[in-house]
Swiss-Prot record:
Subunit-level organization: Heterotetramer of two type I and two type II keratins.
Lineage start: Eukaryota, Metazoa, Chordata, Craniata, Vertebrata
Note: There are two types of hair/microfibrillar keratin, I (acidic) and II (neutral to basic).
Keyword Hydrolase: no
IF rod domain sequence ranges: 111-422
Species whose genome carries this gene: Bos taurus (Bovine)
Region called Tail, residue ranges: 419-493
Record cross-link Glycyl lysine isopeptide (Lys-Gly) (interchain with G-Cter in SUMO1), residues: K217
Name of this chain's protein: Keratin, type II cuticular Hb3
Annotated InterPro entries: IF_conserved, IF_rod_dom, Keratin_2_head, Keratin_II
Length: 493
């Protein structure tokens, strides 16, 4: 879009306007401010008592100041010595179609909100960085605590190893005691086997003695039967002797009676006379001798047999008593040894159970320690991962912060460069002012004591932007319109 404008020199304006009047401002300040907006300079704050359409024909003595961010300029001029009449320009009575962009203020407000949001984000990033630093310190503290805790818990392993070594030594002692008790048990079993053999021998001897006793008893019975037979024979012989005695006595009595009845006594010298008394006496003596000898022999034999049997019975009874005592003693010894063996077995089983329980407890404690160690290692790994994530986020935040710092530094350098450029001397400044209240015409403007600048008024509708430049025109709008005052003398807008 081309913007043509007419040059207005410093002169005197007239106050006699019908609809369009030019008025000089009161003695005071004339300030034009500008705020940068996407490469377009927007100037605000022009004070001077303008109407809807007014043209300033002259300025009283005053001054202007620069108080804008991107480019600004103050204008001032000398007041005319008197008011002269001017001719009325009918073209000035035509209302201007400014076509101001209504979204400019909204865009500025959005810019402010975006700047606020960026500031809030920057503050949030700073807070997040601080929070991440605190979290980093907390994680470092936790890591140090877990490392110290791991070191403390790692000291438990030698204790468990010492306890396991003690249990192993006790198990070895128990095994040695078990071997010793096994050897003693074998010795006791050998002694027991010897006693069992002796007991079996004694039982065999007892059976032999009982057999001998039975045989001797049979012999005694036979002797007693023989004694009974001999006694019966002796009685029979005694009865027979008595019978024969009575018989001989009766025969003698009969013979004596016969002899006494005979009155003739014959005396004969017969040497062959039979003496029955002597014969009977001799027979009786023989029988008595035989009976006494038989009785004596039977009694002596019976007595000897009885003595032998009694001695054998006494001897075997003593042997049996000693055997019974030995058997009882062996039974007591067997019971005692059995009790000792049972006690040793119980003690061995208890020790084995204690060793097994100790091994199980050691295994459980070792597994628990390993599980705790694995949990701590997992927690440490997780903490390392969390710390790595936090470090990554922290690095990202620091990168974002660095980018923001670079942008801020870049903006600062740009602003400082622009201020430095503004502080330095500038050339001719073209001012294009358009607002909703009308156009502004400034003649022979001065910027900070520099050479006069030429002001121009765009009669065509503009976007409402005020542009001040040295040899360049800012865009006047988005529409393809031209300023009706003529062509731009310093360049195209």
């Amino acid at each position: 879009m081309t913007c043509g404008f007419s040059t207005v020199g410093s002169g005197f304006g007239s106050r006699a306007f019908s609809c369009v009047s030019a008025c000089g401002p009161r003695p005071g300040r004339c300030c034009i401010t500008a705020a940068p907006y996407r490469g377009i300079s927007c100037y605000r704050g022009l004070t001077g008592g303008f109407g809807s359409r007014s043209v300033c024909g002259g300025f009283r003595a005053g001054y202007c100041s620069r108080s804008f961010g991107y480019r600004s300029g103050g204008v001032g001029g000398l007041s005319p010595p008197c008011i002269t009449t001017v001719s009325v320009n009918e073209s000035l009575l035509t209302p201007l179609n400014l076509e101001i962009d209504p979204n400019a203020q909204c865009v500025k407000q959005e810019e402010k909100e975006q700047i606020k949001c960026l500031n809030n984000r920057f503050a949030a990033f700073i807070d997040k960085v601080r929070f991440l630093e605190q979290q980093n310190k907390l994680l470092e503290t936790k890591l140090q605590f877990y490392q110290n805790r791991q070191c403390c818990e790692s000291n438990l392993e030698p204790l468990f190893e010492g306890y396991i070594e003690t249990l192993r030594r006790e198990a070895e002692c128990v095994e040695a005691d078990s071997g010793r008790l096994s050897s003693e048990l074998n010795h006791v079993q050998e002694v027991l086997e010897g006693y069992k053999k002796k007991y079996e021998e004694e039982v065999a001897l007892r059976a032999t003695a009982e057999n001998e006793f039975v045989a001797l008893k049979k012999d005694v019975d036979c002797a007693y039967i023989r004694k009974s037979d001999l006694e019966a024979n002796s009685e029979a012989l005694i009865q027979e002797i008595d019978f024969l005695r009575r018989l001989y006595e009766e025969e003698i009595r009969v013979l004596q009676a016969n002899i006494s009845d005979t009155s003739v006594i014959v005396k004969m010298d017969n040497s062959r006379g039979l003496n029955m008394d002597n014969i009977v006496a001799e027979i009786k003596a023989q029988y008595d001798d035989i009976a006494s000898r038989s009785r004596a022999e039977a009694e002596s034999w019976y007595r000897s047999k009885c003595e032998e049997i009694k001695a054998t019975v006494i001897r075997h009874g003593e042997t049996l008593r000693r055997t019974k005592e030995e058997i009882n003693e062996l039974n007591r010894l067997i019971q005692r040894l059995t009790a000792e063996v049972e006690n040793a077995k119980c003690q061995n089983s208890k020790l084995e159970a204690a060793v097994t329980q100790a091994e199980q407890q050691g295994e459980v404690a070792l597994n628990d320690a390993r599980c705790k160690l694995a949990g701590l290692e997992e927690a440490l790994q997780k903490a390392k991962q969390d710390m790595a994530c936090l470090l990554k986020e922290y690095q990202e935040v620091m990168n974002s912060k660095l980018g923001l710092d670079i942008e801020i530094a870049t903006y600062r350098r740009l602003l400082e460069g622009e201020e430095q450029r503004l502080c330095e001397g500038v050339g001719a400044v073209n001012v294009c002012v358009s607002s909703s209240r009308g156009g502004v015409v400034c003649g022979d403007l001065c910027v900070s004591g520099s050479r006069p600048v030429t002001g121009s008024v765009c009669s065509a509708p503009c976007s409402g932007n005020l542009a001040v430049s040295t040899g360049l025109c800012a865009p006047c709008g988005q529409l393809n319109t031209t300023c009706g005052g003529g062509s731009c003398s310093l360049g195209r807008c």
